[in-house]
Amino acid sequence: MKGFTDLVDTLKLQLSGDDVPDVTQVNQGYGSLGQLVGAGLLTPLDDAATAQDWAGRQGESLLAVNGRFSPDGKTMGSGDLYAVADRGAWVGLFMNAAKAAELGIAGPPTTVDELVAQMETAKAGGVTPFMFGASDGGEQIWLMADLLMADTSPQVLTDVINGTSEQLPPEMLDVANTMQDWAEAGYFTEGWAALTSTDVLGMFAEGDGLFTLNGSWNVFQSDTPENFRLVPFPLGSASELAAIATGDLPWAVPSKAKNPDLAKKYIDFITGPEASSIWIKNGQVPASVSGNEAQEVEANGLVGVSADAILQWANLVTNGTTEPFPDWATPTWYDTIAKSSTALMAGEITPEQFVEALQADYGPFTAERKASS
């Protein structure tokens, strides 16, 4: 099995060869898209984006998250546009609304304090508060990012991922304390360290637990879809609507493509209104927003988390902030956060040691990237 670095190297070889596709999908972040841009292997798409008003479809924030880089591949989130997603992908709080009603909980939490209070209510009622699985790393990475936004602001998370500073914000220690406190309080699934986020989502779909954290790409089918909700993680302020919200693997045009104009037309179509309606009809989240999502969701009979995935996405793109996945900050941060956070929540390391481990990965990479740009 090839590792991520091997896959990036393979794509580099493919795009630098003689038999190059006109369009290709790429991974976002410094470890993939940044390397391809820096190697001069992709064509900027700004001319098509301007002519077809792609920012009007997806919002400039989302375009920047998925595909903007400086030409040297060293600065993410600004510069030329090199890739555009056709489908949306965002991380939110799944809630068993039926179980919440049984516990006397009126609706989704709007602050972290409300979330904690609702988890306490669930625990007292014999319900697992938070279905949590850590063995694949994703859920604790998402939780860390959401807690950081709630403790500070979405802009702080943006700055961390883009590497604005070589030092992590001091509030990261508060986040670490919260993660450890929740584990020690017994909010998480029994045996959480050995379970994946997919494992616990399946258990949640069967009726276990009050909450879980997962992505819109994992919307599940249920015999009682009206019993479940999917909402953004509570940040505590109506003006702070934000979530980890990017796209499926975005489309890019190789520099050596033989038909670059045709390739751009394909990207324009696959992100346009006709394709978006097809995505919704199939229960998927289109990256582009039309303003007609509510009518299309109703017309296609989507309810519960299937409807929420699309409608909440449209609201995020239109009225909120779309944040990159935090592990995009360095090529190795996913593994660093996953391993260190598991040790943190298991009580094997202190919050201070957790932050030190993240900084030891983040600081040198960010400094080297800045020095070479």
Residue spans for each PLM region:
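Glycine-centered hinge/linker elements that transmit conformational signals in sensory
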Residues: 119-121, 161-192, 224
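Conserved N-terminal structural module of periplasmic/extracytoplasmic solute-binding proteins
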Residues: 1-39, 51, 107, 237-239, ...
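Extracytoplasmic/periplasmic substrate-recognition and gating elements
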Residues: 185, 223-286, 339, 349
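Short, solvent-exposed loop/beta-turn-alpha elements that line the ligand-binding surface or hinge
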Residues: 46-61, 134, 151-174, 235-244, ...
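Hinge/lid segment of periplasmic solute-binding proteins
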Residues: 31-90
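C-terminal capping/gating helix-and-loop segments adjacent to ligand/active sites or protein-protein/ligand interfaces
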Residues: 160-161, 307-362
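Short helix-initiation/N-cap motifs at beta->coil->alpha
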Residues: 2-10, 112-116, 191-205
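Extracytoplasmic/periplasmic solute-binding protein
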Residues: 72-86, 91, 116-164, 200, ...
